[in-house]
Curated annotation (Swiss-Prot):
Main subcellular location of this protein, as a coarse class: cytoplasm
Oligomeric and partner information: Component of the eukaryotic translation initiation factor 3 (eIF-3) complex.
GO biological process, one term: formation of cytoplasmic translation initiation complex
Organism, as annotated: Cryptococcus neoformans var. neoformans serotype D (strain JEC21 / ATCC MYA-565)
Recorded family membership: Belongs to the eIF-3 subunit M family.
Protein purpose: Component of the eukaryotic translation initiation factor 3 (eIF-3) complex, which is involved in protein synthesis of a specialized repertoire of mRNAs and, together with other initiation factors, stimulates binding of mRNA and methionyl-tRNAi to the 40S ribosome. The eIF-3 complex specifically targets and initiates translation of a subset of mRNAs involved in cell proliferation.
Keywords noted in UniProt: Cytoplasm, Initiation factor, Protein biosynthesis
GO cellular component: eukaryotic 43S preinitiation complex; eukaryotic 48S preinitiation complex; eukaryotic translation initiation factor 3 complex; eukaryotic translation initiation factor 3 complex, eIF3m
Protein name: Eukaryotic translation initiation factor 3 subunit M
Domain PCI: 205-375
Basic and acidic residues bias locations: 429-443
Length: 443
């Protein structure tokens, strides 16, 4: 079977079917019964025998036999049992060759046959207790995807079968799906935009189920670029809120047409666009009124506290941005964030770990000293009249500091020059004194 890819075109149709039947026999419930296995294989041989062994099998008969083989693959859950690992892949390569040469590849019956086999392989992998069988199944689905033409409308469903298998049985992260690879694939698949959206939303759900919320959001954003559907918009906004270290909604809101389809999430979006400190109390009200929306999203780790955490951290960044002295005492932070003073340090540490600010905590003085502020929040990038005024004040302070530093340097240079002059004059007097003493000694 290892050489079936090379020799498949050279095999007769009967031999191809016999090879497939022999492979399937290993997955039979009574596979250890040699008589039953032999009868199983001979049954398929009999179906493709021509009169006196001469001539080709008629096309209609071929299709009937191949459909029977496909049904058996489905019944035996992909036929993943084999004498050696490579046999599973080789047999499925042969099966794909038989399907593509028996049916018109543009026909619905061909597409359905491939999908049925893919689903059977996935199901067999998910139900097996042997990791090697699951790994073999994943390779089969990868090979099937690569066997299909790049524009094949069956590729999306094949890829989803593979992703579903990996997500439930192995490791979805083992299948990198970078945008640079996905976008060309999407554009080449011969499917309508609605099916592309369906693929992307389903794939997003698989990543969400494994806890990779950032990737799930990335795929939903791509889906929105295909078609702005209210349900997808709502899902994308909630996912953006759920991603732990994402503090803005720009990627989603930047898609044309999204802002007009916000629906139920309009209120929470507005919290990220208004006054940062006021947003905390408004956020408490919104989360209390939308518990069913938050819980119904079914996003791992996404709760009302997830939303309030982000609002508080954004408010903290806003306070840091507006501080003229680049330092903040605990009391005003606690008041603005609606927390106890004893909790301030915890929130500052969270902001630092989230790379929103770089700051140092002074416990004796109960204040934080701000070294730098990130631009990854919408509030830190917002620049209005108050920000211009603050910038003007800071520029004046910096200008004053620079002038003072320059004055200190100039004074130091003057002192240094004066000291050098005095040293030179002192040296000359010492030389004159020495000459005088030498002269007196000679006399």
């Amino acid at each position: 079977m290892a050489d079936c890819i090379t020799i498949a075109p050279e095999l007769s149709f009967k031999d191809q079917i016999t090879e497939l039947a022999a492979h399937l026999s290993r997955s039979l419930p009574n596979a250890d019964n040699q008589v039953a296995v032999k009868e199983f294989v001979q049954g398929y041989e009999a179906q493709v025998d021509t009169e006196e062994g001469r001539g080709d099998v008629e096309d209609a008969k071929k299709k009937q036999v191949v459909k029977s083989i496909v049904d058996k693959f489905v019944e035996l859950k992909g036929g993943l049992e084999a004498a050696k690992e490579s046999e599973v892949e080789s047999s499925h390569f042969l099966l794909q060759h038989v399907l593509s040469t028996t049916f018109d590849q543009a026909s619905e019956e061909y597409a359905q046959a491939v999908k049925d086999v893919n689903e059977a392989v996935k199901k067999g992998a998910q139900e097996t207790t042997k990791i090697t069988r699951a790994e073999a199944a994943s390779r089969v689905l990868k090979n099937t995807y690569n066997f299909l033409p790049s524009n094949s409308p069956i590729r999306p469903s094949t890829l989803l079968s593979l992703m579903s298998l990996l997500a439930s049985t192995l490791d979805l992260s083992a299948l990198p799906l970078p945008t640079s690879t996905l976008l060309p694939a999407l554009s080449s698949w011969s499917i309508p935009s609605s099916e592309k959206v369906s693929f992307l939303t389903t794939a997003s759900g698989l990543y969400q189920s494994t806890g990779n919320l950032a990737k799930a959001l990335e795929l939903l954003t791509l889906a929105l670029k295909e078609s702005v559907e209210p349900t997808v918009v709502e899902r994308a906004v909630l996912l953006a809120l759920a991603v732990p270290n994402k503090f803005e909604l720009d990627d989603v809101l930047a898609v044309q047409g999204v802002k007009e389809q916000l629906g139920k999430v309009q209120g929470v979006v507005e919290l990220f666009e208004g006054d940062e400190v006021e947003a905390i109390e408004k956020g408490k009200k919104w989360t209390a009124e939308n518990v069913s929306l938050i819980e119904g999203a079914g996003i791992p780790g996404f709760t009302s506290e997830t939303v309030l955490r982000k609002l508080r951290l954004i408010a903290l960044v806003a306070l840091c941005t507006k501080s003229e002295t680049r330092q903040l005492e605990y009391a005003p932070i606690a008041k603005a964030l609606a927390i106890e003073e004893s909790e301030v340090e915890t929130w500052v540490i969270d902001a630092v770990r989230s790379k929103l600010i770089v700051a140092r905590i002074s416990q004796p003085q109960s204040l934080i000293r701000i070294h730098s502020i990130s631009s990854i929040t919408a509030s830190s990038r917002r620049f209005g009249p108050s920000e211009w005024q603050l910038l003007e004040k800071r520029l004046e302070q910096w200008k004053k500091s620079v002038n003072e530093a320059r004055q200190v340097v100039e004074e130091a240079e003057t002192v240094a020059q004066q000291g050098l002059g005095q040293q030179r004059r002192g040296g000359k007097r010492r030389e004159e004194k020495k000459e005088k003493e030498d002269k007196e000694e000679q006399e």
